[in-house]
Amino acid sequence: MQENYKGKAYDILKNLNIEEGDLIEIKKGDLRIRGILLPSYSKDDRIFVIKLDNGYNIGISIDNITEIKPIEKKSSKDRESERREVHNGAKSEIKIISTGGTIVSRVEYETGAVRPALTTEEIIQFLPEINEIAKVDAEVLFSILSENMKPEFWVKIAESVKKAFDEGNTGIVIAHGTDTMAYTASALAFSLRSLQGPVVLVGSQRSSDRPSSDSAINLLSAVITAKYAPFGEVVVNMHAESSDTYALVHRGVKVRKMHSSRRDAFQSVNDKPLAKVLWKERKLVMLNEKYISKKDETLLDAKFDNRVFLLYYYPGLDRDFLEQMLTNTKIRGIIIAGTGLGHTSSDHIELFRKATKDGIFIGMTTQCLFGRVNMNVYTTGRQLLDAGVTPLEDMLPEVALVKLMWVLAHEQDLEKIQNLMITNLVGEINPRHTLDLFPRWSYE
């Protein structure tokens, strides 16, 4: 199979009966390069794409190649011999639900490309150590990029979690893309109450075809958490540092992705992580004694009203533009990420007053992320309070947004909406901050 190659490169492969997925060796002068031939999607028809043993993909120009030869045909590789024991027919303890992302992807030996592991057997093949921890079962709910996540998908995930608990599983692992994983964690936390066990969201910052991949450690740590954690909460389980020593378990309504690419991108904000996972020792160590205990029966209440928006205040926010948004008849609620203790320009206060009188909920969070809103300190804050803006304590803006979607789907009366938004339902509000909750960056 050479259909992804064209021109001169195609002719060379055809003459040597080399196909994509074959192990080949290329000689250019004194340099010998060995790897798996991958599909080429380059417009240049004089390039071979090779996956090296170290996991990296490289392109090699056919110019000045002195020799190219097949080493091993893909069809001769007995991949079945790599399969490990799977608990077929046995009742699973941990359900792994895949929604997309790279966390449960694996290298496809036929081509060297990466694709999702679709079955329990493939996950065990990808990470056989799971068998040492628990009997697992896997389900692909859907496979989407996390930026395409929507409230209706949150409902489907919540329903699948409820079903998995009803089937007798004691813990759930949800594979998810990292970019919007914190949103989904919040949505599930409000949708699923009295959890019978941990619901662990896990993702990967580096795909499994890269030497620095965090996929295996994160997934293994998530299964350890789902198996041994004493809490019945929705959590996020991710790498804790740049090395591979341990992972951290973050409360789902107190976590945020704080770096675009680092493996330890996820951090607890205004709260301590619930636990750390020593994956080599297969051990979970609790770090936070304040957690929601497991209950006897999981309650499902998953519905959302997405007629909301998140307003990130900035100097110069146009009043007319804001007025157009506030007078949109579809809007039922607004979360403001305000400055400092919870402020916007005083120019906008009367617009907010009119909106709240019209029944629109307006909640205030802080752009600072760390710390809490206090609108009683300065004049502008007090004026915003008088205009009907509701301070939302130390809630993260994204968590407040998801919570508002959930609350609006359950209540119509503004006063009841306000009361629910300031009620600590699942740990989204931390009433007491200690000095150690704020990270200190060292430049020494």
UniProtKB/Swiss-Prot annotation:
Keywords annotated in UniProt: ATP-binding, Ligase, Nucleotide-binding, Protein biosynthesis
Domain of life: Archaea
Molecular functions (GO terms): asparaginase activity; ATP binding; glutaminyl-tRNA synthase (glutamine-hydrolyzing) activity
Active site: 102, 178, 179, 257
A GO BP annotation: translation
EC number: 6.3.5.-
Domain Asparaginase/glutaminase: 92-424
Enzyme class: ligase
UniProt cross-references to InterPro entries, sorted A to Z: AsnA_fam (IPR006033), Asp/glu_Ase-like_sf (IPR036152), Asparaginase/glutaminase-like (IPR006034), Asparaginase/glutaminase_AS2 (IPR027475), Asparaginase_C (IPR040919), GatD (IPR011878), GatD_N (IPR040918), GatD_N_sf (IPR037222)
Catalytic activity reported: L-glutamyl-tRNA(Gln) + L-glutamine + ATP + H2O = L-glutaminyl-tRNA(Gln) + L-glutamate + ADP + phosphate + H(+)
Family named by the database record: Belongs to the asparaginase 1 family. GatD subfamily.
Subunit structure, interactors included: Heterodimer of GatD and GatE.
Role played: Allows the formation of correctly charged Gln-tRNA(Gln) through the transamidation of misacylated Glu-tRNA(Gln) in organisms which lack glutaminyl-tRNA synthetase. The reaction takes place in the presence of glutamine and ATP through an activated gamma-phospho-Glu-tRNA(Gln). The GatDE system is specific for glutamate and does not act on aspartate.
HAMAP family xref list: GatD (MF_00586)
Descriptive protein name: Glutamyl-tRNA(Gln) amidotransferase subunit D
Name of the coding gene: gatD
